[in-house]
Amino acid sequence: LDKAREINPSPLIEYKRIAIEDFDFAPNSFDIVISSLTFHYLESFDKVCTEVYKCLTQEGVFVFSVEHPVFTAYGNQDWIYDSEGKPAHWPVDHYFQEGVRHARFLGEDVTKYHKTLTTYVNGLIKAGFCITHLVEPQPDESMLDTVPEMRDELRRPMMLLIAARKN
């Protein structure tokens, strides 16, 4: 937070460090809420949706990205390799069994919470949101020529981006 304050010391910005599950902002206090790659680390998505909905103004927008449920389903988040060491296929198992998954990320053991696409979509709908966009990003065509291993990223979705509007 010190670095953020240093980069943008505007008195109009209030920097806080709190767990997402504990945030409690005043109703109708934001026009937009953006979250990047966070919710697969939280057990409950429904609670987040309810709280974000409350703090958004009418017609406010909620935009977020998560690791795609196909990516988080199996847990170890790695390919199954063939006898030559090349990716043979991506394991998708226990997809409908939501809950704790253990993975290695940047050399660290991390705990994630797998959720189905249904959970993300219905969590938004139950909170009162109208989904306006849903995207499963793919590598740009130019990357496929310059970074050959990116071709494997066309074999399964890794990320999910959703935008929703408060009704």
Where are these regions (language model features)?
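A short glycine-rich, Lys/Arg-flanked "PGG" loop and its adjoining helix->strand segment in the class I
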Residues: 46-61
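Conserved SAM-binding strand-loop segment of SAM-dependent methyltransferases
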Residues: 9-22
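A short acidic, Gly/Pro-enriched loop at the edge of an enzyme's catalytic core
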Residues: 21-32
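Core SAM-dependent methyltransferase catalytic element
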Residues: 127-129, 147-167
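Short alpha-helix
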Residues: 99-100, 111-134
